Amino acid sequence: LTIFALSLTACGETAAESETRTVYAMDTVMNLTVYGENAAAALESAEKELHTLDEAVLSRTAEGSELYALNASNGETVECGADDILPALIETALTISDATEGAFDPTLAPVLDAWGFTKDERRVPSADELKELLSHTGCGKVALEKTADGWTVTLLDGAQLDLGGIAKG
């Protein structure tokens, strides 16, 4: 019986190789760990993809990103392709906001800016300033429409999006 038990443990898989790296992307420090034979290569690929998504799509502070352009659209309708990541993420954000009865609000970008969360200088905005900024928030100010060719997105009444609350997860 003892020999049988020992033979079973010998048949188990050995611990997988792992590689860990600390990465700064999306205004956040992240620890990535990848397991498997090609862990280092997979980690390199994951880090590259994170930076690409951040800079090209999800950053609201990088002038070349899709989200930056949408936030700067001043209420103009923006067209997106059917396979674009941004409208799918906006749809998910709106769904989560609805499910949480507004506790999660992706339209708080101006409020976050007022506090200085994406800048080097933090400050406490006045109650009047916050009241004014909050008048431009709420998911009702995001018009997301599925079209035959993809999506259209319109941010109404000065609304701006920050998708950091879900883009990282």
Predicted regions and their residues:
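Sec-dependent N-terminal signal peptides
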Residues: L1-I3
